[in-house]
């Protein structure tokens, strides 16, 4: 990764900050310890899973695909806390900047319009006030730049806030009554200006029984102020979708189960259901995908000045924000989806939904409306659907998909890590089954160290 000296660290962070330096020391050095919980103390992971398999294997006669689903996740159970040193993670960071450059075509207007039509019940959303937005936000997480402390410690230093390109303006004396956050009564003695920067973080995910099997996901820790501005739209957007059950996963798992049931009950008997699997969806979330999400949002929001300014000034931040990846080092440039954005899930869900519609439109068919997606996770069907249709359509927009990882079946599907089968029902509903092997793994392993005495 090339060094970039365009942004000085002191312009993005309130220094000195011992906590920030200590944090980046850990990022640079990594974390080699495996943290186990007290559950099944004294037993190896393989021993616990083997003992449990005696209860699961008898199900293979009646529900073979359920046991296949369980065994697939059994192979991935293992440590989650191992963190590689930064020097071994640079390639993962590069993917965010490189993968958006793959050949891509715009998502079709007809597909975007289909999603807009699906969202017509909630059209006219007006951005929420900053005060109400902050009241609903979690305050126990890190505030990111510039203060890098708990959010609750710097609410007063952050509110009210605005942005100007890559500049975040904090502690403004007031928010305009018309929610025009780009106009303020200037008070240089009170307000402060900082270059915005996301902070490199990580999430550990099980990938197998060995220490080097741990999957390390790049996390972009966003500035508190940027999240506030983003959530002025994404909070009411998600709440409106929940009200009309437009995205079942934003409502509840029960809503997902009901929609899956409708999908199986309305699809053709010989039509397959395809559970899509992307390779590095965040990293490949390029300008074509970004524009699809923005186009949909532009029709869901009202036509006010604040909405227009939000689309032009706040929406793009998650794709352009600089990344502080080490102490004193900040990388700039356009990139894929920053995971710590307040709109990550929403943008990806809207764009992914457009891909589902486009796939059916290209096949001259109608997407089964009970198809679903959330972020990069999706399940879809329409008459005559094939996995080749899906891959051909999705990869046209710069996405990478491995054909062998797409799950295809007429009777069952896996969505949001839960297995559903058209014949496995409770009170008529195709309820989802979470992997018991994965659950056992989460009971035994932890991503961070927690003192068992204060759990």
Region annotations inferred by a language model:
Residues 1-207:
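Non-catalytic, polymerase-adjacent accessory regions of viral genome-replication enzymes
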Residues 162, 177-215, 259-269, 310-329:
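Reverse-transcriptase-like RNA-dependent polymerase core
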Residues 205-249, 320-337, 346:
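Glycine/proline-rich, flexible active-site/cofactor-binding loop segments
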Residues 216, 229-230, 242, 283-286, ...:
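Short helix/loop capping segments that flank catalytic or ligand/cofactor-binding pockets
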Residues 220-283, 344, 357:
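Active-site-proximal segment of RNA-dependent polymerases
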Residues 268-374, 379-385, 393, 412, ...:
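Conserved polymerase palm-domain catalytic core
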Residues 382-437:
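Polymerase palm active-site segment centered on the conserved acidic dipeptide of motif C
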Residues 426-455:
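Conserved NTP-donor binding/palm subdomain of two-metal-ion nucleotidyltransferases/polymerases, i.e.
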